[in-house]
């Protein structure tokens, strides 16, 4: 199944939050969740280790979850 980020990627707020992660994290997220690229392809295209891409994705997801849940509390 899709995760929260994949399901809500079209949502403007989620998109802006992803972009606020900054490079290279935002590019990794766009490649992974918007264009559905494989992690090994992302690592090759960006010149990063596969483990680096995985780490940045999981850290970024944690950050996004925190930012998005904070935003929900404010709504």
Language-model features and meaning:
Residues 74-75:
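Intrinsically disordered, low-complexity basic tails/linkers immediately adjacent to helix-turn-helix/homeobox/MYB/SANT
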Residues 36-37:
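Residue-level signal for the short linker/turn that defines the boundary of a DNA-recognition helix
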Residues 40, 46-70:
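DNA-recognition helix of helix-turn-helix
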Residues 24-25:
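The N-cap/first-turn positions of alpha helices
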Residues 1-19:
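Acidic, proline/glycine-rich intrinsically disordered inter-domain spacer in sigma factors
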Residues 19, 33, 65:
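Short, locally clustered residues in the helix-turn-helix/winged-helix DNA-binding domain
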Residues 28-32:
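A short pre-motif secondary-structure segment
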